[in-house]
Amino acid sequence: MASRIAKDVTELIGNTPLVYLNNVAEGCVGRVAAKLEMMEPCSSVKDRIGFSMISDAEKKGLIKPGESVLIEPTSGNTGVGLAFTAAAKGYKLIITMPASMSTERRIILLAFGVELVLTDPAKGMKGAIAKAEEILAKTPNGYMLQQFENPANPKIHYETTGPEIWKGTGGKIDGFVSGIGTGGTITGAGKYLKEQNANVKLYGVEPVESAILSGGKPGPHKIQGIGAGFIPSVLNVDLIDEVVQVSSDESIDMARQLALKEGLLVGISSGAAAAAAIKLAQRPENAGKLFVAIFPSFGERYLSTVLFDATRKEAEAMTFEA
């Protein structure tokens, strides 16, 4: 009997399950399934690209464990994806991150031994990128992975996420719904799905408050991980059939409903993807169609955010019963 023990934690990445949404999708004429990326080793879809970008740079001879210092600007989850891979492979990692991101993300990054530099939240991801470039310029053997520009980002989704969805749905997928942060997921997985069936539609999700892809202006919003305020070079906008806008409030409410009605504790961007997919599945022309939405991350990473404000206050105010 062959051993099924993984060589290290990076071998556990991928092959996440798909599950139908039932109660929150009541009244829909189409069906909605979620790809549960919270089941990754470090609980987010970014585990895939963290591993992919480091491995790709290693194969190209651009970095070496124990010598190279990896640097990356991130809103949090990519940092975690890079952090556990860097720890397993023996790299020092410096992360720049807007100070508005959740406390959990800071703690997790520090737990993995990351050197964390917080940046002005008013400057968003652009501020984090500028700080990372400044650090890179003065760091010997520094190497920036650049998730917004690195082809290894969409490549891993083309090689793994897309095929997993195609196989998991038995090729019966009609629409793929993905929030757009770097654009790597929708570009890579979407390209693969369209190659299998040109009729598969790709739906990008962005915040109403920062609807860049729809021709709007960048603005502050509460959906951590999507709506970066610019169009990343990794994103192939030509692949996208439609951009669906959802508000921060809609996304937060849906994330809460997913916990209460589906037993799925997810982050705010999962709420955004679900809200968008349900809107699509409610359209009469989509009767009988199957939409797969990416749920990027686990809700436990958002306990200190607006998502769990009321719950946290209730929990903190509780006293024991005699």
Curated annotation (Swiss-Prot):
Interaction with the sulfate transporter SULTR1;2 enhances its catalytic activity. Pathway: Amino-acid biosynthesis; L-cysteine biosynthesis; L-cysteine from L-serine: step 2/2. Keywords: Acetylation, Amino-acid biosynthesis, Cysteine biosynthesis, Cytoplasm, Phosphoprotein, Pyridoxal phosphate, Transferase. Changing K222A: Impaired interaction with SAT1. Changing K217A: Impaired interaction with SAT1. The keyword Acetylation applies. One of its GO terms (biological process) is cysteine biosynthetic process from serine. It comes from Arabidopsis thaliana (Mouse-ear cress). Disruption phenotype: No visible phenotype but displays lower levels of thiols in roots and leaves, and also an affected sulfur balance. Also shows an increased sensitivity to cadmium stress. The modification N6-(pyridoxal phosphate)lysine is found at K46. Changing G162E: In old3-1; displays a early leaf death phenotype. Abolishes cysteine synthase activity. GO terms for cellular component: apoplast; chloroplast; chloroplast stroma; cytosol; nucleus; peroxisome; plant-type vacuole; plasma membrane. Pyridoxal 5'-phosphate binds at N77, G181, T182, G183, G184, T185, S269. Its cofactor is pyridoxal 5'-phosphate. Homodimer. Interacts with SAT1. Component of the cysteine synthase complex (CSC) composed of two OAS-TL dimers and one SAT hexamer. Interacts with SULTR1;2. This is Cysteine synthase 1. Changing N77D: Strong reduction of cysteine synthase activity. The gene is OASA1. Acts as a major cysteine synthase, probably involved in maintaining organic sulfur level. The modification Phosphoserine is found at S178. Belongs to the cysteine synthase/cystathionine beta-synthase family.
